[in-house]
Structure formats: structure tokens, C-alpha cells
Amino acid sequence: MRIVSAGVVLPGVILAGLFAACAQERIEIFDAHLHYNQEPRPLYSLNEVRDIFRRNGITGIIATSRPNKGTHELMDAKWPELRVVPFIRPYRVRSDIQTWFNDQKIFELIKSEYARGYYRGIGEFHIYGKSAQSELVKRVVDFAVERNLFLHAHCDEEALLILFRHNPKVKIIWAHTGFSVSPARVAELFDEHSGALWGELSYRGGITGGDGKLTSDWRNLFARYSDRFLLGSDTWINERWFAYDTIFKEYRRWLAELPADQAQRIASGNALRLFGLRRQ
């Protein structure tokens, strides 16, 4: 097929690519890893945050903040164009990252926050290796399962498997999809934990190659498991807020290489399905 317009002849394959790219420019995105922590709040007011979301086509977020006040503010804003899915952050201050899993006061924090009545998950939390075997971590896992909450775990594979051993019914969003775990191993873990494990893609290495294009391994992984991935910004430091536009421009660039149905699921469809939300 060829299209002739203004004297220009475009082969059908080129035209299809242009249509796909335009579609991904318009696609809605759900940011499944958004922190509104203490540090950026003096620099980025709620109105400025809203403007950032609008210009990047963000229509939903997982909000997880340190302290949780940042998430409270995002919930209280009640912006009609944005679905906010709040997660409990088990941190009061940044140093809790290193100790939360043995601090009984953190469990009290989780219970106190949960009493607000709107939370859908716990995390993002950091846990590595055998630290996940602590009694407190098991209590958190069981608490989540009993209340149908997701966990958002920044962890290595060893800790991930321990979380599932604590309670096989747990539902985990794996922050960064293991950073550098091989695509083949990611596929194995998805198969082993069908309906219980999803991968969030911020900071994930290897998705694109030196030419900026999707690698064959990740193209194949997205083809097989497009229903298991989520996008995220991970605004853990102010620089990530500064780079927000660039982060999502890059996501849109490689989403445009995927079939439209795969791109739509990864961009927002999976998050909407997981949290029982409808498109606006």
C-alpha cells in the first residue's frame, strides 16, 4: 500500500510506523512509582506537580511518600483528571530504609496509616537477601494478604522469593524488575508466580540497546508478558522530578516500537486492571 499526499509517496510500512508513533505520543500513562517526598515539596508545589502530570499525559499514579504526608496531600488534592492509588511507605525518615524490617514501631506506623481507609498497598520498601526473613517482614506480608494489599518491593531475587515463602498469596509489584536480572529469569519468575508478580520498569537496565532501540530480549519479553509490566518515574530525589519529562519521553519512544495493544497495557492498562479502575 502507498499513500500519495502533496506529491510525496509513503510506503505502507513507513506510514504504519508514523501512525504507531503518533498513537504512543497520545497514549495515557500510569506512573506506578511516584514519590512526593519531603525534599521536593519546597521546590515543587502541588500545582506544579499537577502541571508536570498534565504535560506528560499522566492519568494515574501509585503515590508512596516519605513521610506519608506527601501521599495524604496528593489524595486530598482530588484532581479529577488523576487517579491516585495510595501505598503506605514504611519510613518516617530516610534512615528507616536500613532498619525498618527490624523496627516494631514501623508496624505500628503501617497500622496507623491503614486506618485512614484508602490505602491499596505497602511500599515501596527496600529489602535485600536474608533480611527478608525477619519476623516483622512476615507480619507485614501477612497483614497485606489479609487486607488484599499489594506490596511494592525494591529487592533482590533472594528477598523476593522469601516474601513469597512467607505467604504464597502475596501480590508483589517488583520495583525496577530486579534492575539487572536477566530477561530469561524474569520470565521464569513470572511463570512461577502467575497472577502474583508484576514488574515496574524505572531504572531497569537492558530494555534498549546502544542504538536506543528495544533489544530483542525485551521485545520478546514484552510480547509474552505485556500484561505484567508497569511504568514508573521513581522520583526518589529532586533530580528525578527535574528529569520527569525526559523519563516519560524515553518510555514513549520505545512504547512506539511495540504493537498498540502491548503498549497500551504497559502504559496504563495493567495498572487500571490491577486496581479496578476505569479509563476516564
For every predicted segment, state its role.
Residues 2-5, 10, 20-33, 41-65, ...:
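Mid-to-C-terminal alpha-helical segments outside catalytic/metal-binding sites
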Residues 30-34, 61-63, 84-89, 122-123, ...:
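Hydrophobic faces of well-ordered beta-strands that scaffold small-molecule active sites
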Residues 34-45, 94-101, 209:
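Acidic/histidine-rich helix-loop elements
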Residues 35-37, 66-67, 89-93, 125-128, ...:
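Active-site beta-loop-alpha junctions enriched in small/polar residues
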Residues 40-41, 114-188:
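Divalent metal-binding pocket/active-site signature
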Residues 45-48, 68-76, 104-110, 157-161, ...:
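Alpha-helical scaffolding within the catalytic cores
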Residues 69-150, 198, 205-206:
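Active-site gating/metal-coordination segments in enzymes
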Residues 175-280:
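H/E-rich (His + Asp/Glu) clusters that bind or coordinate divalent metals
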